[in-house]
Amino acid sequence: MQYPERDLPREGTLDRLLVAAQYLTGRVSSKQLWRIVGATRSTLPLEEVRIRLRREGFSLELAGAAFALIRAAAEKTKGMRHHDVQLVGGWAILQGMLAEMETGEGKTLTCTLPAATAALAGRAVHVITVNDYLAERDAETMRPVYEALGLSVGCIKAGMKPDERRAIYRSDIVYCSNKEITFDYLKDRMTLGGRPRPIAQRLGALAGDERGGKVLLRGLQFAIVDEADSVLIDEARTPLILSAPVDAAKEEQVYRDALRIAKALTEDEHYFFEDNQPMLTEAGGERVRELAAPLGGVWSGPRRSERFVLQALTALHNFQRDKHYLVRDGKVQIIDENTGRLMPDRSWEQGLHQLIELKEEVELTGRRETLARISYQRFFRRYLHVGGMTGTASEVAFELWAVYRLRVAKIPTNQPVRRVYLPDRVYGRAEDKWAAVIESIRERHAARQPVLVGTRSVAASEHLSKLLEEAKLPFRLLNARQDADEAEIVSHAGEPGRITVATNMAGRGTDIKLAPGVKELGGLHVICTERHDSGRIDRQLFGRSGRQGDPGCCEAILAADDDLAAEHATLAAGWFTHMTLLPQRAGRLLYWLAQRRAEAAHSRARRSLLTMDESLGDLLAFSGRGE
């Protein structure tokens, strides 16, 4: 069995300079993209299109013929007809671009165009999105369209057994989350013993090697990445690590000693934080050596001792309950920062997870030993063809080109955007902010206008819930702890008088439909209660209102002591905490500065991860091992 994927050599300085020059000199031609609209009038039969696509590739003529068939299938099975702008978006994706489409413009329907066209051409298509909920929803929604074209569709979800996964990956089109497919790829690498080489695979098959029949995927042929900036940028700061448990009993005392020593240190005197990472002072290093001296064993080496204690300081101060993780059923479960969802089968590495378990006084799980690892940057660059779509990509257009060779094509809206942005309000203290949030909700609720309130953490959403209860305002809560009724809550969020409080679970991919009469009330009103590290995530929240030409309104009600400002604009934020309400210009400047610094720090982290990942890959390749 062949396992097609791209083999990219490591780039040098001159290569990166050439890439930058190509970005500056090249541009997406709007005129060229719009030619697909005329080509979609073709009336070629399905079987002829299928045969010619496999033989001739994605020419304008054949893509137009395929799009015409897909549009007809969607209209027949779903009563949905692709708009011209969706044809343009689909053509951009098919050409290996990232289509930037305004939120609410129908990316799910747009995706059927390149996905079905590539599948008709015989490519194994992966439609990759940010979570299982969206993957399953979109696969089931568009299944009738694909089946009308004679194509099979499947959906990979967490908890599936290998045999079930293997069968689903044999479908023409597979919907899945970015984490599920990346871990399945790493499992295949373990099965194959490293990078799959075509010649070696053929020789192995002739020699009776059965490993090819045990792999899950059919290679990395054609990927369409939904919410591409979230997957390719926001989640690219952390490597994907396939691991196996190690006996925890032998290491438990080491973790307990590390926490005990860390708690004995004093901030500023013994340690400080730089870029949110703990660092020991000279006095701190001496104090650690003094406390570790009687312990012996692994504590004998000063560098190792300092590393243990720094990790314990990270667990104590950088990771907060109900923000970064939940304690559920006696276990520490990670909350995905970008989606607001739980990741119960994931754990932090290098003993951090065990240190947090001890901090929370729950049963200790075994540290996990790394079997294989890869970054999203390296994984997605291995696809033979990758395209994508999102509502927010312009801010990171250069990084998308430099890392993935993805150009951003901005697609116009089908109807004018009627979303109204109210001026930001930045208060000096959180108490004043929450009072203003309650008052804004009360005013909208009195007018029967539905309200969606976005928070960054479970703790913040539950704090607001208590305030709403005290104000006797009815609401629904959606967060990682209260997620059982997600579809039902979202389906009612656009009804008159509804108040919905949610974390990022109600952000990307959430389509809140307005009930009859709500347009006349002004549409959905969205309140952002805390800025995210990236302005793109804020835009995604605001994009839940004013979709597809509907009216809508949004506002940000913030505080100078919110986490983002406190961490990334500490000095500036300190000037304003004594004020009740900041002047508009000062508030905008404070959060502009904080977000720029946060995004710069994340960009450095992504570059550092890619460099380290490439170096590790070179080292392991030299040693004859896989990733």
Residue ranges and their predicted role:
Residues 1-582, 588-627:
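Conserved P-loop NTPase motor core
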